[in-house]
Design a protein with these regions (language model features):
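Domain-level signal for soluble alpha/beta catalytic cores
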Residues: 1-232
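Single conserved hydrophobic/aromatic residue that forms the stacking wall/gate
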Residues: 231, 236-240
């Protein structure tokens, strides 16, 4: 019997109105821009409660059900806990400053934003956050879910480096921080893990110079049995 290719989604979904946080990009679009320092500062001040946890689980369950109803084989939790799919990871790693934002032009000039700054060496000194997020969402899914994480190059392009000034070394440290989460996910039972690196398609020279090494570092010593995904996006204009 022939079977089709398994289907999945990139990861994020619009946040339900009942959630206690807003999406970084949605907040920015309210002003017709792509920058929302208010959303960053609001999330920094946010302190989740037990009632909020129930809402995040409810949102994950609703979004997973939508995907399964649409025929998706490997759903995600919609990244419902994240105010920004990149910055959420950074908040769990030391070295990032979310109090004093830096203005930067990013995505090859596509837009400007006030971004968290790297002011010290990147160190993953706290317990991994991903096992909790994964197990809470997996508990309300009848199918194995996929967990998504930002890749080193994508993190680098959405933060302000005020410390390293060395892309290769920064990518290596960021890759190590993602690797710790991935290995913890596998230990928690996650078998579908995606690293988002849309910047590979925009910055080919950097992708070949150090991006591939950073991505490989993300999956270093990850036990066999886990299915790894890499999310790439094509730029608006392709020059051939």
């Amino acid at each position: 019997m022939k079977t089709g290719l398994p289907t999945t989604v990139i990861g994020s979904f619009p946040k339900p109105d009942y959630l206690p946080i807003r999406d970084w990009f949605d907040s920015a679009r309210d002003t017709g821009e792509m920058d929302s320092p208010e959303a960053t500062r609001s999330y920094s001040a946010y302190r989740p409660s037990d009632a909020d946890e129930a809402l995040f689980v409810r949102a994950a369950e609703d979004i997973i059900a939508l995907q399964i109803a649409a025929g998706i084989d490997v759903p995600t939790d919609g990244e419902v806990r994240r105010e920004n799919y990149i910055h959420y990871h950074c908040r769990h790693v030391s070295g990032f400053d979310f109090d004093h934002l830096e203005h930067r032009v990013l995505r090859d000039g596509a837009y400007a934003a006030d971004l968290p700054a790297i002011r010290q060496a990147i160190r993953h000194e706290n317990a991994p956050y991903s096992p909790h997020d994964f197990t809470a969402s997996q508990a309300v899914s009848p199918r194995p879910i996929k967990f998504t994480l930002p890749g080193p190059m994508t993190i680098m392009d959405t933060t302000a480096d005020c410390f390293y000034h060395d892309k290769r070394r920064l990518a290596a440290d960021l890759g190590d921080s993602v690797n710790r989460e991935i290995r913890a996910l596998v230990d928690a039972g996650c078998r579908h893990i995606q690293v988002d690196e849309p910047l590979f398609a925009r910055q080919l020279d950097d992708a070949f110079a150090f991006g591939m090494d950073g991505l490989e570092r993300c999956f270093h010593k990850v036990p066999s049995g886990a299915v790894s995904y890499t999310h790439l996006t094509l730029p608006t204009i392709l020059l051939v």
